[in-house]
Amino acid sequence: MAEGSAVLRGSSNHKVTLVTGNDGKRREVQACLEGHVLVENVKLDLPEIQSDSVFEISRNKALTAYDIIKSPVLVEDTALCFDALGGLPGPYVKWFFERIGPTGLIKLLEGFDTRRAYATCVFTYCASPDVVLQFEGRCDGRIVEVPRGEGGFGWDSVFEPDEGCGQTYAEMQDEEKNRISPRAKALVALKAHFCL
């Protein structure tokens, strides 16, 4: 989904401000864009609208961040959607995770026949209020029976992507996760759009 047009060419002369307070996200984004664009990081306490759409949430945060910073920003929102729960917790997964942790997320599926789920990530690049571009990455997989792995962050220990050779994101090396995660896929789409 794109509005307007934007120019972002790969070189250290071009920069974008990643708006996140999550060090794990920051590391993943910098690893994926390294050598293409200078990524600066700033933590802003942005209001997050309540919506079932990660596109809408990410867009709103990007426009708000741009209004504060007044230079190109990159903002991200993610969702973890359980088939058995009609897509919940979806974009609310951060708050679910903070309240009930990984074991609580797993328990949400007790009594259901399916553990299928998908993770999605939407990056919004905003160069002005008229230039807003969005890039999505998605991974299908399943919610495991017990948390597995020590790496990653957030819900990485409960989601086993179909592409993950039987491992959760928390069990993978960073290089592997950065190749198949929804965040990585969204960044690949961003790089392709800008010919990076």
Curated annotation (Swiss-Prot):
Organism (species): Trypanosoma cruzi (strain CL Brener)
Pfam families on file: Ham1p_like
Protein family per UniProt: Belongs to the HAM1 NTPase family.
Stated role: Pyrophosphatase that hydrolyzes non-canonical purine nucleotides such as inosine triphosphate (ITP), deoxyinosine triphosphate (dITP) or xanthosine 5'-triphosphate (XTP) to their respective monophosphate derivatives. The enzyme does not distinguish between the deoxy- and ribose forms. Probably excludes non-canonical purines from RNA and DNA precursor pools, thus preventing their incorporation into RNA and DNA and avoiding chromosomal lesions.
UniProt keyword annotations, A-Z: Cytoplasm, Hydrolase, Magnesium, Manganese, Metal-binding, Nucleotide metabolism, Nucleotide-binding
Gene3D superfamilies: 3.90.950.10
GO-annotated biological processes: deoxyribonucleoside triphosphate catabolic process; nucleotide metabolic process
GO cellular component: cytoplasm
Family annotation (NCBIfam families): RdgB/HAM1 family non-canonical purine NTP pyrophosphatase
UniProt-annotated binding residues for Mg(2+): 48
Secretion signal, residue range per the UniProt entry: none
InterPro entries named in the record: ITPase, ITPase-like_fam, RdgB/HAM1
Cofactor: Mg(2+); Mn(2+)
Cofactor, how bound (note): Binds 1 divalent metal cation per subunit; can use either Mg(2+) or Mn(2+).
Binding site for ITP: 20-25, 61, 77-78, 94, 153-156, 177, 182-183
Catalyzed chemical reaction(s): ITP + H2O = IMP + diphosphate + H(+); dITP + H2O = dIMP + diphosphate + H(+); XTP + H2O = XMP + diphosphate + H(+)
MF (Gene Ontology): dITP diphosphatase activity; ITP diphosphatase activity; metal ion binding; nucleotide binding; XTP diphosphatase activity
Enzyme Commission number(s) of this protein: 3.6.1.66
Compartments reported by the entry: Cytoplasm
Name of protein: Inosine triphosphate pyrophosphatase 2
Subcellular location, principal: cytoplasm
